[in-house]
Regions:
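Short, charged low-complexity intrinsically disordered segments located at boundaries
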Residues: 60-62, 144, 171-177
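Active-site/ligand-binding-proximal alpha/beta "capping" segment
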Residues: 123-148
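C-terminal structured domain segments across diverse proteins
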Residues: 103-106, 138, 169
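Thiamine diphosphate
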Residues: 1-126, 130-131
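Short, solvent-exposed polar/charged micro-motifs at secondary-structure junctions
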Residues: 52-53, 139, 166-168
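Short intrinsically disordered, low-complexity coil segments enriched in acidic
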Residues: 1-7, 149, 155, 177
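Conformationally flexible catalytic loops at phosphate/diphosphate-handling active centers
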Residues: 152-177
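A structural signal for short coil/turn segments at secondary-structure junctions
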Residues: 87, 151-152
Length: 177
């Protein structure tokens, strides 16, 4: 919830997601909390549909985000390359899970950093934020939305199963421009 709350505090307007563990908690939070004038939340049928939807939203000027896990992130490669080439701001959250291929959806692992830094063909290096605590998740959620807007391109936000499922009290966040 901290990551989602941070992104919302930064003005997130458009969230599209496919339910894939352990990223589903972000989709559920957004469905329950991202409401208001000009805001949109939708569950789609695939990760490819999700990346293309936020590409369109980013192209239209909306602060947009999706979340997935390792196998879904692999499917977003072409869309991330297009976002980089066309300078379309968007955020993709990769909630890492253990194992290769489809992986182990209920196990934790921190293994996607290299994939997130180089998600598409060509000489592309994406900015990646990797928070380590619940409090850092809040600020990383906000920073990722702001960086995508500032630098006009995709930003990857890494999390992992244990962090995504953890609940704890944090200091009241300081909100400013």
């Amino acid at each position: 919830a901290a990551l989602s709350l941070g992104a919302t505090a930064a003005g997130l307007e458009f969230y599209v997601g496919y339910p894939i563990s352990p990223a589903t908690t972000i989709l559920i939070w957004m469905e329950n909390n991202l409401w208001g004038e000009g805001r949109f939340v939708h569950q789609v049928a695939s990760e490819i549909e999700a990346i293309n939807a936020i590409l369109g939203a980013g192209f239209a000027g909306k602060k947009s985000m999706t979340a997935t896990a390792g196998p879904g992130f692999s499917l977003m490669s072409e869309g991330l390359g297009l976002a980089w080439m066309a300078e379309i701001p968007l955020v993709v959250v990769d909630v890492q899970r253990g194992g290769p291929a489809t992986g182990l959806p209920t196990k934790s692992e921190q293994s996607d950093l290299y994939t997130c830094m180089h998600p598409a063909h060509g000489d592309i290096k994406m900015p990646v934020l990797a928070p380590g605590t619940v409090e850092e998740c809040f600020y990383a959620g906000a920073l990722s939305v702001n960086w995508a807007e500032r630098y006009q391109g995709p930003v990857i936000l890494l999390s992992e199963f244990g962090l995504a499922e953890r609940g704890e009290n944090i200091r009241r966040p300081e909100l400013s421009d």
